[in-house]
């Protein structure tokens, strides 16, 4: 082989390597992107804070809480249209769908009550007093109980949904963050965000059966579960980490950087994607390669103050309410689709 051939082949090999690296980078960037599909203008006042969202897959409804004016929007996901506006829910934060009773429960901070909504009429039928700042909630279906974090009261209120009454209040030495129900382990998990602890509640006895440190995570507030693979995903708002927690070993196994102001976490098991809504103006996107390995796909730029999202696990669409755009007050819901799905 002459010198010219060797040099040509070397240049070709180098170019091929560069091309492969660039394609890999582009593929990774593309995989982390969210494609904006539509924006729905909401009828409430602009520039005021939104909070949790949840989906009723039976009726194809999306429920969006508008904390500022105390409004709940009901959207038909088949038409991408607001079909009902429910008012008189002062400071509404949390919202949880109870499918077996066709009811919806709201956490109404400004009056410290849990609202009960009949989905047949889309009317508020009862308000249940709590102690101080009801926030996130989780439904344990086999036990017919709703677990509501009473954040400032440092407690979890337990509601018997067959009677719509609080049957027990569990107290902690910490403000309580988002709870989640694990249908595989049949446990409720609650973030104790002042102590960096993940508490475990047994719904059969309504007793605390575990108090486990979350390692380097500081201010664990948001949470999503991959129950099948025994994993919890915790947003750490004080030090901008996503912590992956092993629910069998009761210990963290991975930490990944997220954008500032982390709040709500959602998991799409079909795409193996984890989404974290961050107040600074980003949705951090991660991939679960397998239960022990994770990688960050990117921080997708969205409007400032977007801190809550819903993920439709059937269509893989992401719903994010916006209260401002480039400093201009708005009230809208933006629909995204995951790229590379």
What residue spans do the PLM features occupy?
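Low-complexity intrinsically disordered segments
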Residues: 1, 16-17, 118
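N-terminal secretory signal peptides that target proteins for export/translocation
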Residues: 1-10
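Sequence-pattern detector for short linear motifs
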Residues: 9-14, 31
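Bacterial N-terminal signal peptides
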Residues: 14-28
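Predominantly soluble domains enriched in secretory-pathway, periplasmic, or organellar proteins
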Residues: 27-341
């Amino acid at each position: 082989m002459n010198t010219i051939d060797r040099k040509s082949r070397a240049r070709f090999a180098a170019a091929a390597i560069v091309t492969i690296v660039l394609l890999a980078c582009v593929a990774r960037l593309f995989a982390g992107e969210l494609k904006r599909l539509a924006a729905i203008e909401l009828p409430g006042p602009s520039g005021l804070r939104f909070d949790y969202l949840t989906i009723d897959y039976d009726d194809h409804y999306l429920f969006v809480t508008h904390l500022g004016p105390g409004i709940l929007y009901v959207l038909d996901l088949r038409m991408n249209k607001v079909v009902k506006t429910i008012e008189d829910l002062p400071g509404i934060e949390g919202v949880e769908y109870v499918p077996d009773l066709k009811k919806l429960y709201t956490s109404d901070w400004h009056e410290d009550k849990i609202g009960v909504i009949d989905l047949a009429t889309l009317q508020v039928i009862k308000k249940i007093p709590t102690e101080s700042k009801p926030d996130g909630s989780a439904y344990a279906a086999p036990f017919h109980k709703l677990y509501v974090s009473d954040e400032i009261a440092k407690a979890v209120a337990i509601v018997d949904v067959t009677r719509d009454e609080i049957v027990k209040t569990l107290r902690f030495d910490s403000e309580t963050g988002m709870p989640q129900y694990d249908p595989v382990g049949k446990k409720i998990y609650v973030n104790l965000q002042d102590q960096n602890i993940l508490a475990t509640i047994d719904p059969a006895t309504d007793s605390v059966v575990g108090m486990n440190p979350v390692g380097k995570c500081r201010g664990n507030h948001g949470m999503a579960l991959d129950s099948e693979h025994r994993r919890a995903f915790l947003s750490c708002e004080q030090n901008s980490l996503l912590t992956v927690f092993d629910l069998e070993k009761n210990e963290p196994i991975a930490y990944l950087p997220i954008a500032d102001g982390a709040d709500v976490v959602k998991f799409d098991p079909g795409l193996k994607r984890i989404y974290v809504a961050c107040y600074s103006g980003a949705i951090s996107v991660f991939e679960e390669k397998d239960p022990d390995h994770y990688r960050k796909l990117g921080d997708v730029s969205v409007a400032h103050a977007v801190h809550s999202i819903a993920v439709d696990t059937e269509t893989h669409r992401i719903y994010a309410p916006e209260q401002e755009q480039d400093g201009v007050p708005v009230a809208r819901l933006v629909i995204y689709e995951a790229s590379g799905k």
